[in-house]
């Protein structure tokens, strides 16, 4: 009986964690659309084009490398590989992180919103 109780407790904990992660992704998607969606999409194999590049598979990718998109020399030569650690300061103030970027975005000032957007982007793979 004790094992059954532990099993059920473990299942509930797993469900709560999965549910919380799904909520974070959902919040991140909403924030992505609000802050980034005017210029970017994050869609697998999409031919749809907006002002900015498709951000599907962004985490782990080198900055300035989406084929067919014209990047500034600053972006192409930044040497940045996108991760939570590089995205957070970039989403705070892109022009401070990559001086000379052509991205016209003032940044996301709230840390919890940046975190949610980064978690959403990390899941788009």
Functional labels for PLM-detected ranges:
Residues 16-24:
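Sec/Tat signal peptide C-region and signal peptidase I cleavage site
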Residues 106-111, 116-124:
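Short, exposed beta-strand-loop hairpins at the edges of beta-sheets
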Residues 1-8:
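Bacterial N-terminal signal peptides that target proteins for export
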Residues 23-70, 75-81, 89-101, 123-125:
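Periplasmic/extracellular electron-transfer cofactor-ligation site
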């Amino acid at each position: 009986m004790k094992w059954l109780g532990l099993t059920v407790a473990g299942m509930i904990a797993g469900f709560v964690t999965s549910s919380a992660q799904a909520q974070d992704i959902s919040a991140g998607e909403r924030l992505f659309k609000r802050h980034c969606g005017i210029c970017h999409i994050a869609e697998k194999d999409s031919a749809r084009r907006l002002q900015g590049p498709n951000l599907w598979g962004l985490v782990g990718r080198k900055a300035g490398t989406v084929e067919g998109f014209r990047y500034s020399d600053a972006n192409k030569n930044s040497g940045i590989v996108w991760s939570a650690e590089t995205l957070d300061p970039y989403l705070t103030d892109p022009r401070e992180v990559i001086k000379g970027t052509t991205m016209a975005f003032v940044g996301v000032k709230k840390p919890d919103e940046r975190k949610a957007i980064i978690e959403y982007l990390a899941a788009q793979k």
